[in-house]
From Swiss-Prot:
Family under the similarity heading: Belongs to the FAM221 family.
Gene coding for it: fam221a
Organism: Xenopus laevis (African clawed frog)
Annotated PANTHER family: PROTEIN FAM221A (PTHR31214:SF2), PROTEIN FAM221A-RELATED (PTHR31214)
Protein name in UniProt: Protein FAM221A
Ranges of Basic and acidic residues composition bias in the record: 266-278
Amino acid sequence: MEKLQFQGGDRAVDEYAEYRRIVGDDDGGKLFTPEEYEQYKKTVLPMRLQNRLYVSWRSPCGMDCKLVGPETACFCTHRYKQHKTDFKELPKERPVLLPCKVSKCPCKSFHYIPLNGSRPIRCRCKHFADEHSLAGTYHCTKCTKCSGFHSSFTCGCGQPAYAHDTIVETKEERLAQGKPVGHDVPYASMGGLTGFSSLAEGYMRLDASGTGAPGASFLESSQSGASHPFLKMYDMPCTVQGVSEPPGIDKQVSSMRLSEEDDMAYFERRYQERLRKEKEHKRQKNSKPPTTQRP
């Protein structure tokens, strides 16, 4: 069989990928001509560079647990890129509504809903999210007792899903909160993505949109059985005036796995050690004499 070779094939693939990132589904499935493509870029790119909207799923503590991107699914099961994201002028009303552009979809605004693995999360009525209506309070279509979608699914930040909100904000509003905005890009429906770290969940993201970089007080804190796993993993011997000190014998013995121990016995022993240390710390705290004030 004769092998076909095309000159500049890799370049054509890159150009098509760039075209699809910029145009998205605005061409209706039919590729723009070169003239239409240039006219489209002249019309749309200034809007995206000046009026970009950042979309995130935010916890009560202010952490962006999820930064919405083009492929992020809405409550209506359609992607973020299938919603209205380009505005000639930014709306003054708050919250900003991003209606779905899919024909006959009643979704009035993008509303992020997390997944439990690959499946939708359940409401307190025991039915899945996609079994609820898109109108009003998202009442259930399978039962009459549900007054609206309300899920106790726990996010990685420790807060339930119902305590989170889908936030749509401008670049200025985001900068005022000290959150990253990234570079101005011409691509469609970028939402809250500002870099590669935006793909991680908020509690794992060491920037201003997530947990943030740990401070010196955290990194230099003394370690015990209840220390953060990060400190245990990257534990370094402490230094005093440039002389390194070996770790304590008790810590070495505690962290050493005995040959006859299985995994459960090892972790149970460490857990009991931590409980004893907490009780001892509480006993010392309560045994301190109260401070008396002189009359």
